[in-house]
Structure formats: structure tokens, C-alpha cells
Regions:
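Gram-negative outer-membrane beta-barrel transporters
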Residues: 642-649, 662-747, 783, 812
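Membrane-embedded beta-barrel scaffold of Gram-negative outer-membrane proteins
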Residues: 383-387, 391-397, 401-407, 585-586, ...
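Outer-membrane beta-barrel translocator/receptor signature
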Residues: 222-224, 235-311, 319-323, 376, ...
Length: 815
């Protein structure tokens, strides 16, 4: 008896219908039925066939007459034509996509509402918990997951940046434990200057692994994640990096189509729109592009504006399976009225805004002051996999940036009167026209070897870079505060501290550049080798050494020229022991060096720069660091918790003694770094840390400096971002940030000035309306806390005021 849905062959066996056979189910992928995704489909089809056959055999006999079905007539099949090269590439691309889809599905243990990871998800993050990032971008130099890496690395995914409402890199300095904001030369309040673990890192910012020496204002609309490497990193990154380095990972083109638009409105006339679109053009080529528009004032500050626009474009081309070529280009343009902050009330040892002056008081001039920061950079990279053991990569970068401003410094205040309404200050001009041009090339050969049960990932690399900076100023509109005060033409004395009376005065001077810029050029040729040896995922040894040939020149249009060279050799070594698969204990040691003149944005020696007319050339500062730590992946490996003890020492540190620059100082920083990122439960996610430090000047040409702590850093800091998922698509969250006092000075904390400690609280509530639309209400600085970003190094400094309370409504559309 023949059953419906089955037929007999010549031997009377029951067979599955053709539509349920594995071969038919696989034809939409390719004609050969290969790959893990195909295997899964085959298994499913096979189970369906077995179920169908079993069901058929279990049916009771029917009394209906049998139906005879003639077997189809066999016909000769035409010979398959040989596929073209384009068809082969398309087939390979589909096979890769199927494998990637299968891997993504397997990785999502707790997907949102049972779905898969978002199409625009961070490729480096835990698919089930985007607060937890598993790997950093530099996969060759850091081949192991963060759990197995003997170094403290803080990684903020774009989801963390969004929930912190971090739209500019500077906000990371306000809300990250162990990182402090600083002010630059001449009170440059606009460049991103960071201190990591107590050391200046303003020239240790990288974009996709290539140094970005612009010291400009950096937006985050093109950012996938931000990586903070803590501790010396010269063997990875080259010169500097005494306290660590920051790497900005840009958004790259992918294989999944998506569209996302974020629209934001807020207090202080905030209007912001960002766009992010990824489109697969063909199986081998995809494009990702995005844009930014922002028009805004600054919360709690009068007249200050923060307008931005930008765009990025990224492409990925895989002409064959083993070759990937990527490009990206980013443009950002920021403008507005600059803000140099408020004067310092020396008698009360606080900024004037903590002594009764309104926090929004601005001392600039609307008819003169302006600020522009513009940056363009493009990167082309190729990755070729020779075989399973050898991969070659090469990157090329070109960059041009501009930082152009005239601002007003509120300096030399007269605050002796007991009545704050009678206090006065001098509003002095500060200006800069700075351009930065960079050409760089990185080449890596990565080798994966298995020697007697030990798996090696070794990297041999070279790097060549050319950096050129030109720094000019506007005629009569420059003032270096340290010392005798301002003599600039644009200075106005007798400005009332409580109510500046000259904000709208006209200026008869038309700003013009001096035309005699200070120019710096740095050529660096580097070679490095690194190896990570993993024995049964129990013992992991990591080490590397790097040589940098550093060649620096400084000149002006006047007959002033300086040239110097330095040969830098630095190394690192780390050992990891894993008592359990989810935990590691490690010890690490590393060195780094700061060559003379390596802070290219500075024209003064107190900031690490070298004037073209200097007669003194000093050797590199030498840094050594030891770290002992442990890391654990908890909650089904969706929560990474780490703790580390560290000590970093600097020798040959530069300082000015009796007006003469010397290199006889030394200091030490010790501390503990505790961090947690990921989920505590399926609904509750956290990201944050606690850093406690002690610093001490151990050598100095100024006897009174010995034993003092270091200036410009917060020795205790804490931050914690928390988010909880409710039912019906609701989420609530917030952030708490603490920073201890910051003491003023150039090197040692010897001025007696200080900024008070503070707590800052943020909060947000988010509602997913449907699968495409989400709305978020965000409150930043919820209690409207008056706190300060940084203070200048002089005896009577000015102080940068942090933003006040602000509310934002953010609408996100995803398609």
C-alpha cells in the first residue's frame, strides 16, 4: 500500500519526499553542500525526513484501493558548465556568510527577546552582553581574549558610549576611573589632554592602531569602541605611553545590511542627528557610511557653543577568500565660542564660582573669539592569508587636522576685597593656528604555530611614520600665563568678575597670523617582534620587544633650527596562569620611553616640547612598570571582573630648576585598579571601576619637591554605569562618578591650589516602542553639581568649569 507523501523504490523501501531531502535543501547555497551551516541544514532535513517516514510507517492500513504511480522516465542531464570566476567568488562569499551566520547564532546565549544580535552589533563584544568586550582590535598583538591578556585594558563599546551619553572623547576623561583631564600649553582647553594612571597621555591617542598626534577635539559618531591600555605600552605602540594609551576603533563595513538614525533634542538648545548605514553591494563588496549634525550650547555656561558636523565612509572588498581590502575616511568639523573657564579665588583656595560667582559667567568677547577644530583622515588596509599559519597585513594612513582659535583667559584676578561684587580680573587673549599632517605605514606578518602542545601567535612588524606640526598665533593675541602675566594687545583689565562688562564690545583689531610658525617634524622607523605562547590554555607567556628610530627637528622662519635623534628599545613580558577556564592570574613587566620633544603640540619645555632656539638637548625619560592581577569571567562568562596592583616609575624626568631645564627628577605611582563589565543577571548590566593611587616625587633638583605628590591628577576615582531591563521593552539606568581632589602645579603639587572632589550622577530611561523604534530620556549631571575639569599650572590659575545639568530626548530608528 502506498502512503501519501511517500513512494516505493524497486525494493519496496519507503523514501522521503524529494523536497525534504538534504540535497534539495542545500541547492540554494551551492551545488556541493559544504560548510558548517550546510551541515546544520542537512541534519534538520534528515530529522524531518525520518519523522515523515516514521509517521508514514505508523499509519494503520487503509481499505482504499491501491493507486499505481508510474516511475518518471529517466532523462539524460545536461553537462554542467564550468562556473565563471565571478560565480566562484559569489559562491565563496555566500559560503562565508553562512558560516558567519552560524557562528553568530551559536554565540548568542541570551539574545534580546529570543532574537539574534543586532545587525550593527560590535564585532568585538559579547553577542549576549554588549557591555562586555572580549577582544581588542589589534588581534595580532593581542591574540588572546582579554581574560588571557596580562594587562589591564578598559574597553568601552559603542553601547557603553551611548548609555554614558559620550559624544566626544573628552567626556571619557570625566567619567572613567583612572583617567583625568588636563589643560594644555597656554591654557589650551580644547585639545583632548588625558592623564592615565597619573601620566600625561595627550600624544598617546591612536585611531585604529595608528598614532594621532593632533591633540584636537575628537567626536565619537564614527567610533565602534574605545580601548584604554593601562600601563607602559611602548613595545606595542612606540614612544611615550608611560601611563597607557587610548585607541579609537572606527566603524567598519560589514556583511549585514542595516540603517540607523539617532535624533536628539535637549536643553541648552541641543539638536543632534547621527546616521549609520551599512549596505552590501555584492557578495564581495560592502559599504558603510554615516553622518553627524549638532547645534548646541553648553549646559551651565553662558554664550559657549558646541556645533559639529561630520561624515565617514568605509568599504570592504574580498575579491577572494584569503584577501580582504578595507578603506575608511572620516571628516569632522567642530566650531563655536571657546571657554577658558573662570578665575581662581586664591584667598579661599577655590574657583570663584565656588565663592559666589554665578557658574555660567563667561569672560570672552563675542565680537572676536572663535574656535574651529577640523580633522580629515583616511586609511587603507589589506589583509592576506597565505595559509592557516601565516597572515600578512598592511595599513596606510594619511591625516590632516586644524585647530584654530582665539579665546580669552581670565587671569591675574584681584580678589582681595571682601565683597565679591568688587573683584576684577584681566581678560587676556590666547590664540593658536595649528596644523598637523601625518603619513604612516604599518606592516605585520602574523605566524600561528603549534610546537609540542604550545600554540604560538608571533608577530613581526615594521612601522614608518612622518608627522609634521605647524603652530602659529595671531598677532598681539597670545599670552602664556606662567610668569609675568599678559602683555597681549587684546588684553582688557578691570573686568568685573561677577558681571563682565565687555562681552559685547567691538574690537578694532582684525586678527592676522604672525606668519612665523614653529614647525616640528618627526620621522620614526620602527621594527618589533612579539610572541604569545599558550600551553593548553593553562599557562600563557606573552612578550615583545620594539625598536624606534626617532628623528625630530624644530624650526621657524627665523634662523633657528634644532635637530635630534634617539634610539629607543623597549620590551614587555607577561605570564598568565589559569587555574580554571574562567579565571586567570598574571604578572607583567614593561618599559617605555619619552624622547625629548615628543609632545609635538607644545612649544614650551614644561609641556614636553622643544623651542627651536633651545640650547639644551636631553635624553629620553625612562618608564618601568610592574603589574600583578587577576581576571574572572562570571555569570556564564558574561561578566568580566578584574583587579590589579601596579607600580610605575619614571627616571630622567624633566623639570625646570632655577630657570634651567634638567633631567634629574624621578617619581613613582602605585595603585590598585578594579574593574567590572558585563551582566550580573539576564536583566542587569554594569560597567565601571575603582582606581586608588599614591604618587611621590623621589628625586628633584628642587629640594622642597621631594616627597610631594604629583600635580594634575585625581588619586582616587570611581565610576559605575548600571542598566536594568524591565518588561515590555523598558530599561532604566544611570551612572555614578567620583573624583578626588586634584592639586595644581607643573610637576609636583607645589602651588597650594586644588580642585574639590565631587560626585556626579546621571540617569536614563529607555522604551523600545517596536522592533524599529526606541526612545530614551537622559539626564546628565542630575543634581546640577558644580565641578571642574582641570586647572592651569600657574600660582593663580584659571579653571575649566564642567557642564551643568542637561536633559536629552533621543529617538533611535533601526531598519
Amino acid at each position: 500500500m502506498k502512503k501519501f507523501g511517500a513512494r516505493e523504490n524497486n525494493m519496496g523501501q519507503v523514501r522521503a519526499p524529494r523536497s525534504l531531502r538534504a540535497g534539495a535543501a542545500l541547492k540554494f547555497i551551492d551545488g556541493r553542500g559544504e560548510g558548517p551551516f550546510v551541515t546544520k541544514v542537512s541534519a534538520v532535513a534528515g530529522l524531518m525526513a525520518v519523522a515523515s517516514v516514521s509517521s508514514a510507517e505508523a499509519q494503520p492500513a487503509s481499505d482504499l484501493p491501491p493507486v499505481n504511480v508510474d516511475a518518471p522516465i529517466a532523462r539524460a542531464k545536461p553537462t554542467a558548465s564550468k562556473p565563471t570566476a565571478e560565480q566562484v567568488r559569489a559562491r565563496n562569499a555566500l559560503r562565508r556568510a553562512a558560516r558567519q551566520q552560524g557562528a553568530q547564532q551559536a554565540a548568542v546565549a541570551f539574545p534580546n527577546a529570543g532574537g539574534l544580535a543586532a545587525p550593527d552589533a560590535n564585532p568585538y563584544a559579547d553577542a549576549a552582553e554588549p557591555y562586555k568586550v572580549n577582544r581588542v582590535q589589534a588581534s595580532g598583538k593581542f591574540p588572546e581574549p582579554l581574560l588571557n591578556t596580562p594587562k589591564t585594558i578598559t574597553v568601552m563599546s559603542k553601547e557603553v558610549l551611548q548609555d554614558k551619553h559620550v559624544t566626544a572623547l573628552k567626556e571619557i576623561g570625566r567619567s572613567t576611573a583612572g583617567v583625568t583631564l588636563g589643560s594644555g600649553e597656554g591654557g589650551n582647553a580644547f585639545g583632548d589632554r588625558f592623564f592615565i594612571r597619573g601620566f600625561d597621555a595627550r600624544n598617546d591617542v591612536f585611531i585604529d592602531g595608528i598614532r594621532d598626534p593632533a591633540v584636537s577635539i575628537r567626536e565619537n559618531f564614527f567610533t565602534e569602541q574605545v580601548e584604554i591600555l593601562r600601563g607602559p605600552a611602548s613595545s606595542y605602540a612606540g614612544r611615550g605611553t608611560a601611563g597607557g594609551a587610548i585607541n579609537i576603533v572606527t566603524k567598519q563595513a560589514g556583511d549585514t545590511n542595516f540603517k540607523r538614525m539617532d535624533t536628539e533634542f535637549g536643553t541648552d538648545q541641543q539638536k543632534r542627528v547621527t546616521l549609520d548605514v551599512n549596505q552590501t553591494i555584492s557578495p564581495t563588496f560592502s559599504v558603510r557610511t554615516g553622518g553627524l549634525f549638532q547645534d548646541s550650547n553648553v549646559a551651565g555656561r553662558n554664550y559657549v557653543t558646541d556645533d559639529r558636523w561630520g561624515a565617514f565612509l568605509s568599504t570592504k572588498w574580498t575579491p577572494i577568500d584569503d584577501l580582504k581590502i578595507t578603506t575608511n575616511y572620516v571628516h569632522t568639523d567642530l566650531s563655536g565660542y571657546p571657554d577658558f573657564g573662570v578665575p581662581y579665588y586664591k584667598q579661599g583656595n577655590v574657583p570663584v564660582t565656588s565663592a559666589g560667582i554665578p557658574r555660567g559667567t563667561w569672560y570672552g568677547f563675542l565680537n572676536r573669539d572663535f574656535q574651529t577644530a577640523r580633522q580629515d583622515f583616511g586609511t587603507a588596509a589589506a589583509e592576506y592569508k597565505i595559509n592557516e599559519a601565516i597572515t600578512l597585513t598592511s595599513k596606510f594612513r594619511g591625516e590632516h587636522s586644524l585647530l584654530n582659535y582665539i579665546g580669552t583667559l581670565p587671569q591675574n584676578p584681584n580678589t582681595t576685597s571682601p565683597n565679591p561684587l568688587l573683584w576684577t580680573t584681566t581678560a587676556s587673549a590666547q590664540s593658536r593656528y595649528q596644523t598637523v599632517d601625518v603619513w604612516a605605514n604599518q606592516n605585520d606578518a602574523t605566524f600561528k604555530l603549534d610546537t609540542g602542545g604550545v600554540k604560538h601567535t608571533a608577530v613581526l612588524g615594521t612601522e614608518f611614520s612622518n608627522e609634521n606640526i605647524s603652530i602659529d598665533r595671531y598677532t598681539g593675541l597670545s599670552s602664556e600665563l606662567f610668569g609675568g602675566g599678559s602683555t597681549s594687545t587684546g588684553a582688557v583689565t578691570g573686568v568685573n568678575v561677577y558681571s563682565p562688562q565687555y562681552t559685547n564690545i567691538p574690537f578694532s583689531i582684525t586678527p592676522s597670523l604672525v606668519g612665523n610658525p614653529t614647525r616640528y617634524g618627526v620621522n620614526t622607523n620602527s621594527v618589533y617582534v612579539m610572541d604569545t605562547a599558550n600551553w593548553r590554555d593553562t599557562l600563557i607567556l606573552n612578550g615583545g620587544v620594539r625598536y624606534d628610530g626617532y628623528n625630530m627637528s624644530s624650526s621657524t622662519n627665523s634662523p633657528k633650527y634644532l635637530k635630534m635623534n634617539a634610539d629607543l628599545v623597549n620590551y614587555n613580558v607577561g605570564l598568565v596562569y589559569k587555574p580554571m577556564p574562567i579565571g586567570s592570574i598574571y604578572a607583567a613587566y614593561a618599559t617605555s620611553a619619552n624622547p625629548f620633544g615628543s609632545e609635538l603640540d607644545a612649544t614650551g619645555t614644561d609641556y614636553g616640547g622643544v623651542p627651536a632656539n633651545t640650547a639644551i638637548l636631553l635624553g629620553p625619560e625612562r618608564n618601568k612598570a610592574a603589574e600583578l592581577g587577576t581576571k574572572w569571567e562570571l555569570v556564564d562568562r558574561h561578566l568580566l571582573v578584574s583587579a590589579a596592583l601596579f607600580q610605575t616609575t619614571k627616571d630622567n624626568a624633566r623639570e625646570t630648576v632655577n630657570g634651567l631645564l634638567t633631567s634629574g627628577a624621578a617619581y613613582r605611582i602605585q595603585g590598585i585598579d578594579i574593574e567590572a563589565e558585563g551582566k550580573l543577571t539576564d536583566r542587569w548590566s554594569i560597567f565601571g571601576g575603582l582606581v586608588l593611587m599614591q604618587s611621590k616625587v623621589t628625586q628633584s633638583g628642587v629640594a622642597s619637591n621631594i616627597g610631594l605628590q604629583l600635580a594634575n591628577i585625581a588619586h582616587q576615582s570611581f565610576s559605575m554605569l548600571s542598566k536594568y531591563k524591565l518588561d515590555s521593552g523598558w530599561e532604566i539606568g544611570g551612572q555614578a562618578v567620583y573624583r578626588s581632589k586634584v592639586y595644581g602645579g607643573t610637576f609636583a603639587a607645589n602651588t597650594g591650589n586644588e580642585l574639590p572632589s565631587y560626585w556626579r550622577f546621571d540617569a536614563f530611561v529607555e522604551k523600545q516602542i517596536d522592533k524599529n523604534w526606541t526612545m530614551k530620556l537622559y539626564a546628565q549631571n542630575l543634581t546640577n553639581k558644580l565641578y571642574y575639569d582641570t586647572l592651569y599650572r600657574s600660582a593663580v590659575p584659571f579653571v575649566a568649569v564642567a557642564p551643568g545639568r542637561a536633559f536629552y530626548i533621543i529617538t533611535t530608528a533601526k531598519f
